[in-house]
Amino acid sequence: MKKTFEQFRKSNLLFQVLKGPQHLECQKLFVLDSSFNPPHLAHFQLLSQTIKNFKLKDTRSHVLLLLAVNNADKLPKPASFPTRLEMMCLFADYLQEKLPQSVVSVGLTVFSKFIDKDKILHEQFVKGCSADIGYLVGFDTIARIFDEKYYHPLKISDVMESFMSGSQLYCLARGDCHLSAESQLRYASDILEGKFEPVIPREWGARIHVMQNDYPALRNVSSSEIRNKLKNGQVESLKDELPLCIYDYLINNKTIFD
């Protein structure tokens, strides 16, 4: 995987699919945008619940695991990009087994901003299909997307209009967020009621979906928490937070987070 990553890094490519179908094969695309450092069961739960609740009826869904490597010239910490890609490919096989009504691809992009990711996906992955794209993220990411300090002196409503008019955002409420779970679950309805205008247009609330986690035990699972447990020797507890394939990979490669 190191060679594959180096080839991408040295190329002029903006996006590349490394595993799975090279182009969209379904009417609904779910993009799991994460650091995959490592992939875990909370990622799976987000995908599973989103597909269950929002996939188009009687159709298959296409899942894209997308890793942004915009800082590829800097040594990533605490796991290298090739290592993350190996785990993403293992996770893709796990998803294909657990979500048989979906197809799964693994991709790289140089872009970190969602408006840029969305543009390149439409150009090179969706390729003119009238597909609905949903981005699966953490609530903290949604909060950053709509934080006006990242857009000053421009307005969020101007910068993000094209993205929000054609995309959906999905996440699960978390227990370790700066907002209570209740506030997270109300976030979209608060936008619809105009509580964030003029910064966030009220109509965008219909395109944001914050769900209650069906498995409370996974509510606080995060990649950083897993890395800390691994460093502290709390290996057994990780069995409840990781797919078996990722757990085995980490046990056999304990130094990747050093």
From Swiss-Prot:
Pfam families: CTP_transf_like
Main location: cytoplasm
Cellular component, GO annotation: cytoplasm; nucleus
Recorded metabolic or biological pathway in which this protein acts: Cofactor biosynthesis; NAD(+) biosynthesis; NAD(+) from nicotinamide D-ribonucleotide: step 1/1
GO molecular function term, any single one: ATP binding
Binding site for NAD(+): 35-36, 138, 140, 174
Ligand binding (ATP): 43, 224-227
KW Nucleotide-binding (keyword) present: yes
Coiled coil segments of this chain: none
Induction context: Expression is slightly induced in late log phase.
More info: Present with 830 molecules/cell in log phase SD medium.
Similarity comment text for this entry: Belongs to the eukaryotic NMN adenylyltransferase family. POF1 subfamily.
Function of the protein: Catalyzes the formation of NAD(+) from nicotinamide mononucleotide (NMN) and ATP. Involved in the salvage pathway for NAD(+) biosynthesis via NMN. Involved in the filamentation pathway. Suppresses the filamentation defect of a KSS1 deletion.
Protein name as catalogued: Nicotinamide mononucleotide adenylyltransferase
